[in-house]
Curated annotation (Swiss-Prot):
This is CTP synthase. One of its GO terms (cellular component) is cytosol. The active site is at 380 (nucleophile), 506, 508. Allosterically activated by GTP, when glutamine is the substrate; GTP has no effect on the reaction when ammonia is the substrate. The allosteric effector GTP functions by stabilizing the protein conformation that binds the tetrahedral intermediate(s) formed during glutamine hydrolysis. Inhibited by the product CTP, via allosteric rather than competitive inhibition. Catalyzes the ATP-dependent amination of UTP to CTP with either L-glutamine or ammonia as the source of nitrogen. Regulates intracellular CTP levels through interactions with the four ribonucleotide triphosphates. InterPro entries: Class_I_gatase-like, CTP_synthase, CTP_synthase_N, GATASE, GATase1_CTP_Synthase, P-loop_NTPase. UTP binds at residues 14, 187-192, 223. Its EC number is 6.3.4.2.
Length: 549
C-alpha cells in the first residue's frame, strides 16, 4: 500500500487546536485498526525548544530517545499508542542545520543551495522517513497560513500532493468561525479568507475544521462549502468542549474519519470508541472532588505544565473524581503568610523548573506539606527541593542548598551532574530521555507501579549528592529508587507520612487518559483520602484557578 498522508494546517489565528485536531484524528483512525504516525513541523529557527522560555513556548515534551520537542507531541502520545522520537518533530532551525552540514561536506556538488528544491526536499524526506512504518501519517504544520516562516513547509506538502496524488493525501485546514454577539450571528469571512490564502499557494483544503462555540447550522456549512470549493460534508464543526477528551467523539459524530478514509481510498472496520466514551462519561459525571495546589515558577502560562495538568486529570478520572487545580506562584510563598495560602488543599505538587527564583517559596510549601501531613508529590526540581528542605529542617544542616542556587553553600545536597562538569553549552546537554530505575520492595513507588523495574523520561542537569545519603536516610528519608548501577538517586520518600514522594524524572510524559501514570494515580488517591468532607462534585472534570499572579 502506498504511503498515506493527512496534512493539518491552520488559519486566521494561532492556538486554534491543530495539535489536538491531529491527535483526535489519529485516535479515530487507530480505533479503526490503522497504524498511525504523527509528526509536527515547527517554523522557528531554534534547533529545538529546549532552550526556549516556558512563557513563550510552553512545555518542552521529552521523548524516550531524549528529544526535546513541542508540547503537541504530548497530545499525540496521549491520544494514540504512538511512541514518538526526535524524527517526529522538526524545526526550521534543525532542517537548516542539516542542510548546512551537507553543504559544508560537499554533498550538493557545487550547486547553489536554495529553499526550492533543497529545503523542501529535506522536509519531504523527513516525512517519508516517518511514514515508512505505518498506514497513515498525520503531519501538522505549525504556525498560521500567511506566515512567511511556514511557506517552505506548505510548499513541501503542496509538492507531496503533486507527487503522490489525491488518493494518498488529504489537506485538513483548521479555521475560525466566530460568533459575533453584537450581530447575533456566525461569521464565515475569516474562514473564506484563510482558504483563499491557501489557494494562493496552490493548496485546496479537502476538509475544514471550523472552530466555533456552537454547532454550525446547515446554511452556514452550505455557504462555507460554496465559497471554499468543497463538499458540504467536508465542513466540520470543531465545537468548543469542556474536556479535550471529548474532541474525538465530536469528530466521529461529524464524520471526519469517514471522510478522510474515503478520500484516501481506505476500507477499515467500524471504530471501537467504547473506552473513550466511558472516559468522557467519567469526565462529566464525577463522584467526588480533589483539590491540588501546584507550586511553580511558570504558573502564569499554564501550557508550561501541559502534560503535568493532564496527568493529574488522568489520575482523577481513574478515581472518578473532579480535579480542582490551583496554580500558586512560588515567589508568593516567600511571604510570612505562606501557610494561609496553602491551607485547604488535599495535595501539594512542586513541578520541575530551572533557576533559583521562587525556590524558597517551594521550600516553604514542602515544609508545610511535610509537617501538616498533606500528600506531597515533587517532580524533578520538586524532588531536589524536597531533599534540601529535609536537610535543613529535619537534619539541621543550616544553609543546605543546591549548587545551582548557591554555589557557596556549605552543604551541597544537590549538585551538577558529574558528566556535565565543564560543559558550557545549554542546548541538548542535560540528562535526557528514558532511563531505567530500580525500586525498593515495599516502597510507595513499588506499590504504585506494582513492580520494581521501570523506565522513565528525564530532563535535568543536577542530581542528589550521595555524600549526604547517610545523614538524610538516618533522619527518616527513604531512597526508594535508583539507577540499576546505583549512580543516581531517582526517587525519595518519607515513610512516616500519608504520601510524600519526590522523583527526579518526569512521569507526566508517559501518562495517558486510558492509562494513567501510577504515581499520579497514587498521589491523587492519597490526596482524596486527605479530603474532608468528601463532597459531591459537578462538571466539568477539571478546573483551574491562580494564586499569586
Amino acid at each position: 500500500m502506498s504511503a498515506k498522508y493527512i496534512f493539518v494546517t491552520g488559519g486566521v489565528v494561532s492556538s486554534l487546536g491543530k495539535g489536538l485536531a491531529a491527535a483526535s484524528i489519529g485516535c479515530l483512525l487507530e480505533a479503526r485498526g490503522l497504524r498511525v504516525n504523527l509528526m509536527k513541523f515547527d517554523p522557528y529557527l531554534n534547533v529545538d525548544p529546549g532552550t526556549m522560555s516556558p512563557f513563550q513556548h510552553g512545555e518542552v515534551f521529552v521523548t524516550d530517545d531524549g528529544a526535546e520537542t513541542d508540547l503537541d507531541l504530548g497530545h499525540y502520545e496521549r491520544f494514540t499508542h504512538a511512541r514518538l522520537t526526535r524524527d517526529n518533530n522538526l524545526t526550521t532551525g534543525r532542517i537548516y542545520e542539516q542542510i548546512i552540514t551537507k553543504e559544508r561536506r560537499g554533498d550538493y556538488l557545487g550547486k547553489t543551495v536554495q529553499v526550492i528544491p533543497h529545503v523542501t526536499n529535506e522536509i519531504k524526506n523527513a516525512m517519508r522517513k516517518v511514514a515508512a512504518d505505518g498506514d497513515v501519517t498525520i503531519v501538522e504544520i505549525g504556525g498560521t497560513v500567511g506566515d512567511i516562516e511556514s511557506l517552505p513547509f506548505l510548499e513541501a506538502i503542496r509538492q507531496m500532493r503533486q507527487e503522490l496524488g489525491r488518493e494518498n493525501t488529504v489537506f485538513v485546514h483548521v479555521t475560525l468561525v466566530p460568533w459575533i454577539s453584537a450581530a447575533q450571528e456566525l461569521k464565515t469571512k475569516p474562514t473564506q479568507h484563510s482558504v483563499k490564502e491557501m489557494l494562493s499557494i496552490g493548496i485546496q483544503p479537502d476538509i475544514l475544521l471550523c472552530r466555533t462555540d456552537r454547532y454550525l447550522p446547515h446554511d452556514i456549512k452550505s455557504k462555507i462549502a460554496l465559497f471554499c470549493n468543497l463538499e458540504e460534508k467536508a465542513v466540520i464543526t470543531a465545537k468548543d468542549v469542556d474536556s479535550i477528551y471529548e474532541v474525538p467523539l465530536v469528530f466521529a459524530q461529524e464524520g471526519v474519519d469517514k471522510l478522510a478514509l474515503r478520500y484516501l481510498h481506505l476500507d477499515t472496520r467500524e471504530p471501537d470508541l467504547s473506552r473513550w466514551s466511558a472516559l468522557v462519561e467519567r469526565c462529566y459525571h464525577p463522584t467526588g472532588e480533589v483539590s491540588i495546589g501546584i507550586v511553580g515558577k511558570y504558573v502564569e502560562y499554564e501550557d508550561s505544565y501541559k502534560s503535568l495538568k493532564e496527568a493529574l486529570v488522568h489520575g482523577a478520572l481513574a478515581e472518578g473524581l473532579k480535579l480542582r487545580v490551583t496554580w500558586i506562584e512560588a515567589e508568593g510563598l516567600e511571604a510570612p503568610n505562606y501557610e494561609q495560602q496553602l491551607s485547604g488543599f488535599d495535595g501539594i505538587l512542586v513541578p520541575g523548573g530551572f533557576g533559583k527564583r521562587g525556590v524558597e517559596g517551594m521550600l516553604n510549601a514542602i515544609r508545610y506539606a511535610r509537617e501538616n501531613k498533606v500528600p506531597y508529590f515533587g517532580i524533578c526540581l520538586g524532588m531536589q527541593t524536597a531533599c534540601i528542605e529535609f536537610a535543613r529542617n529535619v537534619c539541621g544542616l543550616q544553609g543546605a542548598n543546591s549548587s545551582e542556587f548557591d554555589p557557596a553553600t556549605p552543604h551541597r545536597i544537590i549538585y551538577k551532574l558529574r558528566e556535565l562538569t565543564g560543559v558550557e553549552e545549554m542546548g541538548g546537554t542535560m540528562r535526557l530521555g528514558a532511563w531505567a530505575c530500580v525500586l525498593q520492595n515495599g516502597s510507595l513507588a513499588a506499590d504504585a507501579y506494582g513492580k520494581t523495574e521501570i523506565s522513565e523520561r528525564h530532563r535535568h542537569r543536577y542530581e542528589f549528592n550521595r555524600e549526604y545519603e547517610a545523614v538524610l536516610t538516618g533522619a527518616g528519608l527513604r531512597i526508594s529508587g535508583t539507577t540499576p548501577d546505583s549512580t543516581y538517586v531517582e526517587i525519595v520518600e518519607i515513610p512516616d507520612h500519608p504520601y510524600f514522594l519526590g522523583c527526579q524524572f518526569h512521569p507526566e510524559f508517559k501518562s495517558k487518559p486510558l492509562e494513567p501514570h501510577p504515581l499520579f494515580h497514587a498521589f491523587v488517591k492519597a490526596a482524596y483520602q486527605n479530603h474532608k468532607p468528601h463532597t459531591e462534585a459537578t462538571q466539568p472534570a477539571a478546573e483551574s484557578a491562580p494564586i499569586g499572579k
